């Protein structure tokens, strides 16, 4: 797909309008790029175009099937994360991807034992295949591309994970609101998914610039420090794992082994309707805002971890 300027019909307060997605640097390269590269670099124009091609309603329905329970506004910017969801929902959606498309609602209490070790309560997982294995496999490759693709917005994670790379694979995705008030990062391994959010109680509380407030600068280190400590601790050796080298189903290798040939070094994308000037500021990804495009020339932190046990993820939620 081509990274280019586009307009999409939208509705604001019941009135028809047009909305244009912007990239983090406020420009469009005009280059055709593989989806793997566009995802890794958080190219907003490509994400919105893909969402339109798939159908915004279909995007919303799939998100709900994967574990998102919050209302989703079916506008073009939904592809960039414009609707509010909580961190636990977000992490659970990523768990669905890592569990090969199987969605398990979060379980707070897995079991209760009496003083003699007898089980008096055991949670019963409610697993369902939310998306096809093929789709989950492709998403796993995209998430890993944030680390391996040139210009990937997850590159900063290397400094945290290099001691454990010999026995664990990683992936992840950043996100930042357009005024730098909210920053996100969700990191994945084959056995553990965790997310971090940095923001204020009110969106008037925000970082001054994207360079300071983007997800790769604020939320990514939360995951990085957490996952490093977990995987270096032999008590949690069960979380060390590698992704399969080949898919479990017959999938044409040419559909997921393409390498990037165009990789501008740019900061992550922004979430926006638009800013006050109608352009995007330096930052990361999310956005707001279905119809055919018209082409023309005080901070708080939260962490959520979900255990991808292969069958039934378990989740914990803390708000330091």
Please place each PLM-identified region on the residue numbering.
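Primarily short, surface-exposed interaction patches in extracytoplasmic proteins
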Residues: 53, 57-90, 115-121
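Conserved catalytic neighborhood of penicillin-recognizing serine enzymes
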Residues: 1-59, 103, 115-144
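A penicillin-recognizing enzyme superfamily signal
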Residues: 37-41, 86-262, 266-275
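Ligand-recognition elements built from short beta-strands and adjacent flexible loops
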Residues: 280, 284-295, 299
């Amino acid at each position: 797909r081509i990274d280019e300027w586009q307009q999409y019909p939208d509705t604001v307060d019941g009135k028809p309008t047009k909305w244009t997605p912007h990239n983090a640097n406020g420009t469009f390269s005009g280059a055709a790029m593989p989806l793997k590269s566009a995802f890794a670099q958080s190219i907003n124009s490509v994400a919105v175009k893909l969402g339109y091609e798939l159908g915004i309603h279909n995007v919303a329905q799939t998100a709900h099937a994967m574990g998102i329970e919050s209302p989703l506004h079916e506008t073009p910017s939904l592809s960039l994360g414009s609707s509010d969801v909580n961190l636990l929902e977000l992490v659970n959606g990523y768990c669905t991807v890592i569990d090969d498309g199987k969605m398990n609602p979060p379980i707070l209490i897995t079991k209760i034992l009496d003083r003699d070790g007898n089980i008096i309560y055991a949670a019963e997982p409610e697993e369902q295949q939310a998306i096809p294995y093929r789709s989950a496999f492709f998403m796993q490759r995209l998430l890993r591309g944030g680390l391996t693709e040139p210009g990937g917005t997850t590159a900063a994670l290397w400094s945290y994970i290099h001691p454990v790379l010999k026995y664990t694979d990683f992936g992840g995705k950043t996100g930042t609101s357009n005024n730098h008030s909210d920053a996100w990062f969700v990191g994945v391994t084959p056995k553990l998914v965790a997310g971090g959010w940095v923001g204020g109680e009110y969106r008037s509380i925000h970082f001054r610039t994207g360079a300071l407030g983007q997800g790769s600068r604020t939320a990514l280190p939360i995951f990085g420090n957490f996952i490093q400590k977990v995987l270096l601790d032999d008590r949690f050796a069960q979380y060390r794992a590698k992704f399969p080298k080949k898919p479990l189903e017959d999938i044409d290798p040419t559909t997921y082994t393409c390498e990037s040939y165009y990789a501008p070094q740019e900061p992550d994308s922004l979430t926006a309707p638009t800013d006050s000037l109608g352009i995007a500021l330096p930052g990361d990804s999310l956005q707001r805002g279905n119809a055919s495009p018209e082409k023309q020339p005080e901070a708080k932190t939260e962490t959520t971890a979900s255990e991808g046990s292969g069958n039934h993820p378990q989740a914990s939620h803390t708000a330091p």
